[in-house]
Amino acid sequence: YRFDLSVPFDVSTCSYAQRTTDLDSPTYQNGSQALDHATHEDNHPQGVSISNDGKKLFILMESNTHDRILEYKLSTPYDLTTMSLVLSAGINLGSHVANPMGMEFSENGKRIFIADHHGSHKEVTQISLGGEFDTSTFTVDGEVNMKTLSDLDQLRPIAFNKSGLKMYLGNDWTDSGDDMVHEFDLVCPFNIIEGKCPPITDNKDRTAMVEAQIEIAKRTIDHSTDTALNRLKWIRRNKDKQNLTN
């Protein structure tokens, strides 16, 4: 379903716009790299993400035997009536997840994060893509199991702030306890796996900060060097004088 908001980010102003038709049909489910959906299986859409330009839509599908991420093309941005399955893309999640509940992309579209819970496992899986919002090539970086956190029961949605240095997980308690949103601080943006921190050049804000720091350092060095050189020149000019304290 698509809803339009007359005031940005204000759900009280939303109105129904459109929806997909027969998302369970082979046209929208079969033929991609993510493998086909068996007709006798459950097939639950558990997460939806859209590329920054509105030209791609991704759906996280959970089923009995294999969970998938399907990639769709929107020939008109954000228009669900123009949606078509991208056959050369898609991810078969295989054994990496067992009960995926939520999905989120990094700001630049080069990583996907999946919240998953099954039994005592409460995991977030990180996947790196070969291109921005392109699931045709990918690498599963790994997962973080949060079973030691007693406040977590069933992970649901996942989100990040714009800088990617904070991660948010929605938690659903089945029988008792309060449903919560948990906040986590990350060492580097959009990364939860050791050794997989993205390069600074992947983030224009971080790049700008580093460039500014380098420029400040260069100016400081230039100023210090100029001061020292000017002092030496003065000493040379006045080397025959007895008093050089000035």
Give the residues covered by each predicted segment.
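Short glycine/acidic-enriched loop and turn motifs that connect beta-strands
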Residues: 63-66, 118-121, 173-178
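Surface-exposed loop and turn segments in beta-propeller and other repeat-based domains
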Residues: 15-40, 86-96, 139-151
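Signature of short aromatic-glycine-proline-rich micro-motifs recurring in repeat-based ectodomains
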Residues: 35-49, 97-103, 152-159
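Residue-level detector of Asp-centered blade-edge/turn motifs that repeat once per structural unit
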Residues: 52-53, 107-108, 162-163
